[in-house]
Curated annotation (Swiss-Prot):
Tubulin is the major constituent of microtubules. The gamma chain is found at microtubule organizing centers (MTOC) such as the spindle poles or the centrosome, suggesting that it is involved in the minus-end nucleation of microtubule assembly. The lineage of its organism: Eukaryota, Sar, Alveolata, Ciliophora, Intramacronucleata. It is found in: Cytoplasm, Cytoskeleton, Microtubule organizing center, Centrosome. InterPro entries: Gamma_tubulin, Tub_FtsZ_C, Tubulin, Tubulin/FtsZ-like_C, Tubulin/FtsZ_2-layer-sand-dom, Tubulin/FtsZ_GTPase_sf, Tubulin_C, Tubulin_CS. Its main location: cytoplasm. Belongs to the tubulin family. This is Tubulin gamma-1 chain. SMART domains: Tubulin, Tubulin_C. One of its GO terms (molecular function) is GTP binding. It comes from Euplotes crassus. Signal peptide: none annotated. One of its GO terms (cellular component) is microtubule. It comes from the Eukaryota.
């Protein structure tokens, strides 16, 4: 039986994609912007209680905590048609309202100052759950609040709820979004590696390219990019909200995709893609084979250049629509025959498939749609760009004074050195995973602290 998940939205980007996610969920479950269930959705078979709970007046409230150090985005949410959807007690805006100034150190230290207030909100949500399974964090790793505050929150959640799963939807930036982003990204990466069980990488560069090339948007807006993200988030949770026999809880989804503890960074693909307010311009017949084949194409992968080299560790395709299971079997056979997916040599070379219902409350221009969640060694190319940019900055100590003004860096820069080691280790681990002798790799390295063959111990997370 599906269990509850609490969503934590941190920073400008985290709250923007969180807002789009809740809009999407409301539409898929027949809930109006005020949280009231529409007449036509009264007898649904969906599980709304995974992400929503019902207030005393029976309107649906997201199990969400909204956090930001500057008020603009959350104020916008509170003035939107969805203003009364959220629990006002679960909204935190810094009293100073100045933001974190794109400084990871400020975001991290500000989080430490208000941790009791935040944990109290989360505890209250957790206490209202019958059987809490875990947390979802939405944030960006480029700025100050999503990266710094988000990092501190990951550490605290890990300490405070050691047996609960933590999944993140983390936006990785375009190359020149923020001048100090190599520092912010590296420091955030350490926490994503050590304190999260699963990270869905949302590569802004790839998302923008997909919006231009596939949706034919000349200059994609933030809401349009965020709408693509919300489509991915909603599709990745569809088996939890419309449960079947398999993949109907978060632990099942993650365990099937994460073969070793550190290699828990996933890339995504989605097809056919369209925006809610966009007319479908190309009409084609969507079959299971067509969808599954397209999901493996580079142009549909939401991570820049990530699958040009390397190999898949695992693939889970969530296929939505009216699907005959025999078609799935035939499609998998065809993909195997054509060798469309290159897998690691030491693991099972198979694509897992989860079949899911489509929401009966939303019109779709396509009979079948699909989301791919994939663990691919090539994702390290994104991490290597961050790491190399960081090393270039660090050699010159560029902009380091900005960080030295914060408490965590006022005495030393050990946190940078520690993050450097952890990220470098992940990049090496990911490269080693492509070789047959990976199961013996790192045995002499005391810092690794785990057997690469051992799956994450999800069984204890009850």
């Amino acid at each position: 039986m599906p269990r509850e998940i609490i969503t934590c939205q941190v920073g400008q980007c985290g709250n923007q994609i969180g807002m789009e996610f809740w809009k999407q969920l409301c539409m898929e479950h027949g809930i109006n912007p005020e949280g009231i269930l529409e007449e036509y959705a009264q007898n649904g078979e969906d599980r709304k209680d995974v992400f929503f709970y019902q207030a005393d007046d029976e309107h649906y409230v997201p199990r969400a905590v909204l956090i930001d150090l500057e008020p603009r985005v959350i104020n916008g949410i509170q003035k939107s048609p969805y203003a009364s959807l959220y629990n006002p007690e679960n909204i935190f805006i810094s009293k100073h309202g100045g933001g974190a100034g794109n400084n990871w150190g400020r975001g991290y230290c500000d989080a430490e100052k208000v941790q009791e207030e935040i944990i109290e909100m989360i505890d209250r949500e957790a206490d209202g759950s019958d059987s809490l399974e875990g947390f979802v964090l939405t944030h960006s790793i480029a700025g100050g609040t999503g990266s710094g505050f988000g990092s501190y929150l990951l550490e605290r959640l890990n300490d405070h709820y050691p047996k609960k799963l933590i999944q993140t939807y983390s936006v990785f930036p375009n190359e020149n979004d923020v001048v100090v982003q190599p520092y912010n990204c590296l420091l955030s990466m350490k926490r994503l590696i050590l304190n999260a069980d699963c990270v869905v990488v949302l590569d802004n560069t790839a998302l923008t390219s997909i919006a231009v090339d596939r949706l034919k948007l000349l200059q994609p807006t933030f809401p349009q990019i965020n709408s693509i993200v919300s489509t991915v988030m909603a599709a990745s949770t569809t088996t939890l909200r419309y449960p079947g026999y398999m993949n109907n809880d978060l632990v099942g989804l993650i365990a099937s995709l994460v073969p070793t503890p550190r290699c828990h960074f996933l890339m995504t693909g989605y097809t056919p893609l369209s925006l809610i307010d966009q007319k479908v311009t190309s009409v084609r017949k969507t079959t299971v084979l067509d969808v599954m084949r397209r999901l493996l194409q580079t142009k549909n992968i939401m991570a820049t250049g990530a699958i040009k080299k390397g190999a898949y560790m695992s693939i889970l395709n969530i296929i939505q629509g009216d699907v005959d299971p025999t078609q799935v079997h035939k499609s998998l056979q065809r993909i195997r025959e054509r060798k469309l997916a290159n897998f690691i040599p030491w693991g099972p070379a198979s694509i897992q498939v989860a079949l899911s219902k489509k929401s009966p409350y939303m019109e779709s221009g396509h009979k079948v749609s699909g989301l791919m969640l994939a663990n691919h060694t090539g994702i390290r190319s994104i991490f290597k760009v961050i790491y190399d940019q960081y090393r270039t900055f660090r050699k010159r100590d560029a902009y380091m004074n900005i960080f030295k003004q914060t408490k965590i860096f006022e005495d030393n820069l050990d946190e940078f050195d520690s993050s450097d080691e952890v990220v470098k280790s992940l990049i090496e681990d990911s490269a080693a995973a492509e070789k047959m002798d990976y199961i013996n790799w790192g045995n002499d390295d005391d810092d690794m602290g785990y057997d690469p063959r051992a799956p994450p111990n999800f069984s204890s997370m009850q």
